Amino acid sequence: AALPELDPQALAPITEAVARSVELLGDTPLIGFAGAPFTVASYLVEGRPSRDHAITKALMHEHPDVWDALLAWVARTTGAFLRAQGLAGASALQLFDSWAGTLSVEDYLAHVQPHSAAVLAQVADLGMPRIHFGTRTRHLLVAMREAGADVMGVDAQTPLDEAVALLGGRTPVQGNIDPALLDGPWAELDAHIRDVLRRGATATGHVVNLGHGVPPTTDPDVLTRIVELVHSVPDLLPDLPPGSLPHPDGAP
């Protein structure tokens, strides 16, 4: 049976939540968020998180017509979901492809990229930055950008300056503080953040963010300290060596 199309009225709680958040945030931008077609489809097919997405890939290769129909449906639904957030006041929109890193470049280009591109095309006329992110997607960065992204999110496994170079030095990046360090010693996290900032200075633009989601055990005060640290660091030069960023209190 055909999957039902999304009823626009179902998005009313989303648009209300975004509008209220934007009002409360004032000048602080809000990034809209949606799961990309491959990642959403993998949950539909597997029914749970998967290490290798073998069942998903089997459907992709053994029944390509079914696969394309499924991803086209997800793309329409996701595009409407993302567009609603943009119209409600989000400042940028992010397409989050958590599990795309399990794909080869060939499979991504043939079976996934067209559907991610369809999502990003649905919000192109809104005139706001479109961010595309995936984990373990170093080998897919260029292909993911070519789906229609203005900014590329980079995971914690890929050094930010390497990602910038792979993207030809012309694409702003987002990332990539390692979430695994948020529960560790502050000194280690502090040094890591400074290194991320140094590497990000090689890009044409850098949205400082995590390299994946916030772990549920994270102390919110740590996130506050991260924001304060990032705002305290002066503009960086691309040739600053690791460990050379000054501490805000003047300590070495």
Kindly label every feature range from the protein language model.
Residues 1-10:
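Alpha/beta catalytic barrel-like cores
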Residues 10-252:
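Active-site loop segments of alpha/beta catalytic cores
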